[in-house]
C-alpha cells in the first residue's frame, strides 16, 4: 500500500496529489504543461504538470531520470530550493519562489501547506505496488469505430 510522504503510515485518503508544488512570489509568462523547468542556481530540473495562475502555484514532477529530475552536468538529483529563479524551457516563463510558509485553500476547501514556498507530494514516491500491467501493441482505429472498454478493480 502507498504511504504518506516521509512516513511509513499507509495512506487512507480517497484522492492524493503526487506532484511537488512551488508558490510564486512573482512570475511572468505562462508555464506550459509538460515543459521542462530548470533552476539554474541549484541545477534542479523538472517537468510542469499544471500552472495555477490564479493562486500562483506551479505543480511539477521531478523523477530520477537523465535531464528530467537530475542535473544534466553532474547527473545528481537536485531539488528545487530557495527563492532562486525557475524558468520554463519552451515558454520562457519565469517564477521567483515565495519564502513564506503558509496554508493555501484550494478548490473544494482542500488545503495545501507550503514550507518556505514549497510543498512535497502527498504520497511517498516508490511506495506501494503495481498490481497489474499489460503492454499491448497499438491498434489502428477508424474514425467511425466504437469501442467497449471494461475495467475490473478488486479491493
Segments predicted by a language model, with ranges:
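Interface-prone segments of viral and bacterial extracellular assemblies
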Residues: 1-155
Amino acid at each position: 500500500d502507498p504511504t504518506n510522504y516521509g512516513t511509513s503510515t499507509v495512506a487512507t485518503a480517497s484522492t492524493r496529489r503526487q506532484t511537488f508544488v512551488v508558490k510564486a512570489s512573482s512570475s511572468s509568462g505562462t508555464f506550459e504543461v509538460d515543459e521542462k523547468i530548470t533552476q539554474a542556481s541549484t541545477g534542479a530540473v523538472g517537468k510542469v504538470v499544471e500552472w495555477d495562475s490564479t493562486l500562483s502555484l506551479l505543480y511539477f514532477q521531478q523523477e530520477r531520470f537523465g535531464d528530467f529530475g537530475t542535473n544534466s552536468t553532474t547527473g545528481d538529483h537536485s531539488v528545487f530550493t530557495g527563492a532562486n529563479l525557475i524558468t520554463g524551457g519552451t515558454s520562457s516563463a519565469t517564477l521567483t519562489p515565495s519564502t513564506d510558509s503558509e496554508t493555501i485553500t484550494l478548490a473544494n476547501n482542500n488545503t495545501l501547506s507550503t514550507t518556505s514556498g514549497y510543498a512535497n507530494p502527498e504520497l511517498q514516491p516508490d511506495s506501494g505496488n503495481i498490481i497489474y500491467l499489460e503492454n499491448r501493441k497499438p491498434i489502428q482505429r477508424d474514425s467511425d469505430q466504437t469501442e467497449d472498454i471494461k475495467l475490473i478493480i478488486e479491493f
